[in-house]
Amino acid sequence: MKKIMVVDNEPDIVDLTRTVLEIGGYEVIPAYSGEECLEKLEQEPVELILLDIMMPGMSGWDVFNRIKQKNIDTKVVFMSVLEISEKRKQILLDEGLSDYIMKPYDKDTLLDKVDQILK
């Protein structure tokens, strides 16, 4: 079973996303901050991280950059209520981001994107 870490400072978002992914057949590891995400990654590698951008303390941008600096072999998808331009999205994809999901998301869209990324 493939492991996905869901990182968001909003527990309701983590719980909802976890439920959707578990129904889809994935094992989910929750994290509620950027710091917790990096700590858990050291102990338990995952195939994918669904990462909120705007969090108190260490932001999703900071976490993404740390993952790249440490050469951690995992895919990262940003989740955010903020819309980004296609140009900015392409820059992020070129830097190693796997995708970008707008919140609130449709559960089928989320599962389809995750399935495509992890196939």
Where is each model-derived feature located?
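Two-component/phosphorelay signaling modules centered on CheY-like receiver
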Residues: P11-I29, E95
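Acidic, metal-coordinating helix/loop segments flanking the phosphotransfer/catalytic sites
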Residues: P30-L48
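Acidic catalytic/metal-coordinating carboxylates
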Residues: Y32-S33, S59-D62
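Short amphipathic alpha-helix used as the core "switch/output" element in two-component signaling
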Residues: E39, W61-I72
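Active-site residues of response regulator receiver
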Residues: D52
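Receiver (REC) domain active-site loop signature in two-component systems and cognate sites
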Residues: M55
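Alpha4 helix (beta4-alpha4-beta5 surface) of REC/receiver domains from two-component response regulators
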Residues: D62, E83-I101, D108-D112
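Hydrophobic/aromatic residues positioned on beta-strands within the core alpha/beta folds
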Residues: M79-S80
